[in-house]
């Protein structure tokens, strides 16, 4: 499967449009992940997102795919607004952060329930978006005081298996490590599946 191969044969036909919604707890790194991938920059200032949409093109097997990337708010006060983002979604990426164990717990206790309500059968990708903090001394000290620890790879992988995610991936938006792989190995692979299966798996919010 050629993701970024030669341009020979490209430009033929109309682009295939696919929608990807990114969800997860507030401050878990969703916006930074999208900013680094689509715009190439990381901001140190945290500003809660209400709603934002990105468009990014890539080639899959010489087919131009236009990804519509939807960044959503994780706070409870935006639950109703966020539910409107799920219409006609092909892939949902659930993000969590290793420095906030609750964000991983909420993948199963909150986000999966919401997704099953609005998008039953949609393809899932689980992403740890701040893996650089796993061994951060300040983070380790803070969590130790609360009697907990940073989420480990095996824990994230276990959650991914239980929610039947298509992929589990880790990245560091701050250091731009693994960001492209998240999109090319995660979304692109699932997107290829949805292309070959037609529109199956997309959501309809009533």
Curated annotation (Swiss-Prot):
It is found in: Cell membrane. One of its GO terms (cellular component) is plasma membrane. SUPFAM superfamilies: P-loop containing nucleoside triphosphate hydrolases. The keyword Signal does not apply. It comes from the Eukaryota. Pfam families: Ras (PF00071). It is a lipid-anchor. One of its GO terms (molecular function) is GTPase activity. This is GTP-binding protein Rho3. The gene is RHO3.
């Amino acid at each position: 499967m050629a993701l970024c191969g030669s341009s020979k044969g490209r430009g033929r036909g109309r682009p295939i449009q696919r929608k990807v919604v990114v969800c997860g707890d507030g401050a878990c790194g969703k916006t930074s992940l999208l900013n680094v991938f689509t715009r190439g920059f990381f901001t140190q200032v945290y500003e809660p997102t209400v709603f934002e949409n990105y468009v990014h093109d890539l080639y899959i097997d010489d087919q131009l795919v236009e990804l519509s990337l939807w960044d959503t708010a994780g706070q409870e006060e935006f639950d109703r607004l966020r539910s409107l983002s799920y219409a006609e979604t092909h892939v949902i990426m659930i993000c969590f952060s290793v420095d906030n164990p609750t964000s991983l717990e909420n993948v199963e206790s909150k986000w999966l329930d919401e997704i099953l309500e609005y998008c039953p059968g949609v393809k899932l990708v689980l992403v740890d978006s701040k893996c650089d903090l796993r061994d951060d001394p300040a983070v380790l000290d803070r969590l130790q005081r609360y009697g907990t620890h940073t989420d480990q790879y095996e824990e994230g992988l276990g959650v991914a298996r239980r929610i039947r995610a298509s992929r589990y991936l880790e990245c560091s938006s701050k250091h731009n490590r693994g960001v492209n792989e998240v999109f090319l190995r995660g979304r692109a692979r699932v997107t290829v599946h949805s292309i070959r299966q037609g529109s199956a798996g997309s959501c309809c919010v009533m």
